[in-house]
Amino acid sequence: MSDVENQPFFNIQRVYLKDMSLEQPNSPAIFLEQDMPSVEVEVDVKADRLAESVFEVVVSGTVTAKVKDKVAFLIEAKQAGIFDIRNIPDEQLDPLVGIACPTILFPYLRSNIADAITRAGFPPIHLAEINFQALYEQRLAQLQQQAGAAAGAPNGAPNGTTLN
């Protein structure tokens, strides 16, 4: 093999909106409410190995806005990417998939969610930046804690999945 073939390689093959749903269970009455909505945001990351060097990474986001006890809207979206990653040492592969890939995908997710909320007739909600490294490290610590509590249990990747 030549040196070029052994060089670390990272390529974004595709970025795509995998899934999105929007519910407005209390429309149109909710538009008459004067109170400011409370907003809850949840974000998750999953990864699957599709081939030897090809990974699908999915960043999921759920935004729920409520006025008093009534749901104004609920939006769920999954932004995905297919990444070709080769010649990366195993100890660097999981952080690359769990930190770098979600960092690339999140701006697309944030934009799609803001656009859908606006098109639904609500003021835009701009999701704050996420420190995926801190999220990754937090999950890694949780996995290590669980592994210590249940010695001998198989470990998954900190991004919530086991890479096969």
From Swiss-Prot:
GO BP terms in the entry: protein folding; protein tetramerization; protein transport
GO (cellular component) term, any one: cytoplasm
One Gene Ontology term of the molecular function aspect: unfolded protein binding
Pfam families the UniProt entry points to: SecB
Family membership: Belongs to the SecB family.
Free-text function comment from the UniProt entry: One of the proteins required for the normal export of preproteins out of the cell cytoplasm. It is a molecular chaperone that binds to a subset of precursor proteins, maintaining them in a translocation-competent state. It also specifically binds to its receptor SecA.
Protein name: Protein-export protein SecB
Gene this chain is encoded by: secB
